[in-house]
Amino acid sequence: MENTRDSAAISETKYIKASNRVTIYDFIKLAKPGIIISNSIAAFGGFWIAFASAEKTLTGLAFLMTMVTAMLGTAFVMASGTVYNNYFDRHMDAKMARTRSRASVTGKMPPAMILTYGSVLGIAGLAMLYSLNPLTAFLGLAAFIFYAIIYTVWVKRTSVWSTFVGSFPGAAPPLMGYCAVTGDFSMTAVLLYTIMFLWQPPHFWAIGIRRKEEYRAAGVPLLPVVKGNHVTKIKMMQYIAVLVPVTLLFPFSLGTGHISPFYFLAALVLGGIWIKKSIKGFKTDDDVKWAKDMFVYSLIYFCLLFFIMMIDSFMMFLIR
């Protein structure tokens, strides 16, 4: 009987040790893959648009190497920022249902390991970007500092406008992708940055409305928590209403003189649907359900908009 109990105790100990072992999944989850994927889509969009509109285009192996380096470098720098974000937010995340299982919260990954992981990602990413040109590396470093330090450590904890402030570094990926090809700015690069900047607040405030009570419990002064859902809905609609006409400027920024009816129609339809959905928010009885719909559509809008911008710029590349 005693041997049986000892065997059971040993088995339980082995199970606990195995369950506490850090896995690849823990590292991936800590980097917030959802954010990295959306950032990578934007970065690739910027890269492709720059490639299609550049006077001297990359070809063959040079194109492939530049693209891979730019995408990996951008993803690594952004992942470094999200890992540092998880490190600084671990005590806050412990109070939220959707984040309390993260390895940074449970103690599965000790703080030193998290910082090492984030630092390695950041250094590797910046080195890749610097190998392309100093400007892209500088943009990556600036975005990291702004997001991981200014936004995460300071503004997120103290200001109702943290989402607005966080949009400055959050809009960097398409700019970085563009500059990876050109090595300098242009009206197109600034417009891509502006589009992603305006897209972010409605997207993240939709999450804020859905998870309002969790943010309240964690002490995060997010707009829905402090000002309420109605004010947040007004702000979301204002951003979307500005975003839609700004997206229509994209063909003009390329400076080719070619204006695509396809792009205008697609951008108007996508934007019109989002505006219509935002208006529905003032009539709904279920804010959480509405916010979920807004969140999902914001991702669809984002992906399709960048896709049609890439198609439009490539069509101009073919006819020039």
Swiss-Prot record:
Its EC number is 2.5.1.141. It is a multi-pass membrane protein. Keywords: Cell membrane, Heme biosynthesis, Membrane, Transferase, Transmembrane, Transmembrane helix. GO terms for cellular component: plasma membrane. The chain crosses the membrane at residues 34-54, 58-78, 112-132, 135-155, 160-180, 189-209, 234-254, 255-275, 299-319. It catalyses: heme b + (2E,6E)-farnesyl diphosphate + H2O = Fe(II)-heme o + diphosphate. Pathway: Porphyrin-containing compound metabolism; heme O biosynthesis; heme O from protoheme: step 1/1. One of its GO terms (biological process) is heme O biosynthetic process. PANTHER family: PROTOHEME IX FARNESYLTRANSFERASE, MITOCHONDRIAL. Interacts with CtaA. Belongs to the UbiA prenyltransferase family. Protoheme IX farnesyltransferase subfamily. Carbon 2 of the heme B porphyrin ring is defined according to the Fischer nomenclature. This is Protoheme IX farnesyltransferase 1.
